[in-house]
Amino acid sequence: MNIAIVTINQENAAIASWLAAQDFSGCTLAHWQIEPQPVVAEQVLDALVEQWQRTPADVVLFPPGTFGDELSTRLAWRLHGASICQVTSLDIPTVSVRKSHWGNALTATLQTEKRPLCLSLARQAGAAKNATLPSGMQQLNIVPGALPDWLVSTEDLKNVTRDPLAEARRVLVVGQGGEADNQEIAMLAEKLGAEVGYSRARVMNGGVDAEKVIGISGHLLAPEVCIVVGASGAAALMAGVRNSKFVVAINHDASAAVFSQADVGVVDDWKVVLEALVTNIHADCQ
């Protein structure tokens, strides 16, 4: 089986980490490197079609993200193939893929006979930053073309800062509360040395930054310690913390699903527990 690995602007870490977990024995891998970063898909779609016609591949694999999703879908349409976006794994013998559905509550196994099969990867937490692509692959460079005529202007946003949540070693995930709780939550998190994230339901209550959402529609994290408080354990939220090394769940409902996904669970009012934890930490430090 011939597989084309598409990377964009030498950002290889996510796709390289995913490849390392797959078994591609018996496959011929090629590396299609798009560089520099295109602004819109139209700059590279024609070139991708031409490249596939010169060196056909059974599977064309794109990196995670909205741009990878778009290229996968539109290239498959142009080549009369099939596209599946945000896959988590690929089984070579059956050419079947797995991906999450229904807010991460279900894992689906999908299969199609159409070729080429264009795939984009699901976002991953904790991808090794120094992961490298397999050696020995044929590399083919794809240079983006001119911007399309319909694109009147573009703006390049400089100095976009990365949210501290993405690199935090300790994270406090809050699922309940309202705007009145924000100051107390921030104080507790600071004393715990943790960054704060929120469930989507909590963000919808207002008063917190929507960029702090944890889960499939927000951050996917892999901290050393994650404390989840006041959250039932919905699959969409827990997808954002499932790669944590150690998970503590605090909830007053002993039957909450969050406890089945935690290393340690405490059934109590979460504010009381966090305040006691802060007190004990500071007592031990004295």
Swiss-Prot record:
**Residues that bind FAD, according to the entry?**
225-253
Q: Which GO terms describe its biological process?
A: fatty acid beta-oxidation using acyl-CoA dehydrogenase
**UniProt cross-references to SUPFAM superfamilies, sorted A to Z:** Adenine nucleotide alpha hydrolases-like, DHS-like NAD/FAD-binding domain
Gene Ontology molecular-function annotations: electron transfer activity; flavin adenine dinucleotide binding
Pfam families xref list: ETF, ETF_alpha
Which InterPro entries does the protein's record reference? DHS-like_NAD/FAD-binding_dom, ETF_a/b_N, ETF_a/FixB, ETF_asu_C, Rossmann-like_a/b/a_fold
Sorted UniProt keywords: Electron transport, FAD, Flavoprotein, Transport
Cystine crosslinks: none
Organism's domain of life? Bacteria
Q: How does it assemble?
A: YgcQ and YgcR form a heterodimer.
Q: What does this protein do?
A: May play a role in a redox process.
Which PANTHER family does the entry link to? ELECTRON TRANSFER FLAVOPROTEIN ALPHA (PTHR43153), PROTEIN FIXB-RELATED (PTHR43153:SF5)
Which family is this protein grouped under? Belongs to the ETF alpha-subunit/FixB family.
What's the name of the protein? Putative electron transfer flavoprotein subunit YgcQ
